[in-house]
């Protein structure tokens, strides 16, 4: 299974993805947006640069999924169409987890993506303003049967 955490920078994607791996899926592979950018030397935050980074993460996740591995991805991945096409490609074997928060300051607001397209259907909504990371993880585990 692929667990795809999406949301604005600073929303808690990486924290929740790391907790999911640590507590419930220790053998899963982790793909993180910042690490992908370092690995492929992609510091281009334009729309094309983001699409390229997300496409690379999707290819790696798809490959690992085809090998029977669980994959946990945490990426801003702001483009709805790109995420939906990936879900269709994998016959909807992806759990999309939309991580967001209220208007509080978290320290990475300068990296926010203008025009981020929130999921519209077939996703789990996690508002990290309303619960601790462990409470959010409990919701993920319960709703997705991890």
Regions found by a protein language model. Give the residues of each.
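Walker A (P-loop) ATP-phosphate-binding motif of ABC ATPase nucleotide-binding domains
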Residues: 2
């Amino acid at each position: 299974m692929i667990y795809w955490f999406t949301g604005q920078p600073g929303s808690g994607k990486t924290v929740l993805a790391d907790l999911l791996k640590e507590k419930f899926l220790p053998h899963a592979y982790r793909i993180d947006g910042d690490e992908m950018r370092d690995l492929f030397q992609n510091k281009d935050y334009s729309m094309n640069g983001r699409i390229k980074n997300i496409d690379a993460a999707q290819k790696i996740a798809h490959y690992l999924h085809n090998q029977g591995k669980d994959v946990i991805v945490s990426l801003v991945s702001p483009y709805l169409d790109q995420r939906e096409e990936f879900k269709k490609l994998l016959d909807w074997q992806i759990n999309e987890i939309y991580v967001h928060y209220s208007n509080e300051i978290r320290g990475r607001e300068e990296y926010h993506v203008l025009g981020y397209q929130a999921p519209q259907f077939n996703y789990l909504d996690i508002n990290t303003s309303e619960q601790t990371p462990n409470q959010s993880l409990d919701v993920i585990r319960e709703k997705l049967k991890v």
